Amino acid sequence: MIGLIGRKVGMTRIFTEEGISIPVTVVEVEANRVTQVKSLETDGYNAIQITTGTKKANRVSKPAAGHFAKAGVEAGRGLWEFRLENGEEFAVGAELNVELFNEVKKVDVTGTSKGKGFQGVIKRWNFSTQDMTHGNSLSHRAPGSIGQCQTPGRVFKGKKMAGHMGAERVTTQNLEIVRVDAERNLLLIKGAVPGSIGGNVIVKPAVKA
């Protein structure tokens, strides 16, 4: 399913004709350029590889520069892939823009969540605090028991404990496209999308729409 790569600009709000305020995230989608078309015969699957944005020439490695030059496109800030479904065809060097979503109502947005560093179980996993008084000392925000006794004699994998939070790939599904601004290459998406301002996001038609 083909999508687009954009950059999160921030949040604002727009008003309907009835005066209802709608919170929206603004995603800037510069032209997505096709750098490679992968086929079942040569690569084992059908997909297109795209890039977007710009990158200083002295920041592009020689192999990457050769790859972009072969495709006849300007070097971008990264490379992404989208699997192709039967019947979809794209040419190397072709450009994709926000008009791809003119007929799309709902989208899934993928990004890298904001990093929160090392966090305890209350913030990280929404645990409840223990008693603030009633004889409790130094265990107000502690997780409590993390297992049993000699049997099984270990902590099970996946146990929710304190640790690094955020800075991971997150997808928010079924977000509504409120407006497509082709003139300024903007998508206005209802609600919040993952990541910090300036972060890359992948916008695809919703799989559950």
Curated annotation (Swiss-Prot):
Post-translational modification: Methylated by PrmB.
A UniProt-annotated Pfam family: Ribosomal_L3
Gene Ontology annotations of biological process type: translation
Lineage top rank: taxon: Bacteria
UniProtKB keywords: Methylation, Ribonucleoprotein, Ribosomal protein, RNA-binding, rRNA-binding
GO molecular function term, any single one: structural constituent of ribosome
Residues carrying N5-methylglutamine: Q150
Function: One of the primary rRNA binding proteins, it binds directly near the 3'-end of the 23S rRNA, where it nucleates assembly of the 50S subunit.
Quaternary data: Part of the 50S ribosomal subunit. Forms a cluster with proteins L14 and L19.
PANTHER family linked to this entry: 50S RIBOSOMAL PROTEIN L3, LARGE RIBOSOMAL SUBUNIT PROTEIN UL3C
Family: Belongs to the universal ribosomal protein uL3 family.
Name the record gives this protein: Large ribosomal subunit protein uL3
Organism name: Photobacterium profundum (strain SS9)
Highest classification ranks of the organism: Bacteria, Pseudomonadati, Pseudomonadota, Gammaproteobacteria, Vibrionales
Encoding gene per record: rplC
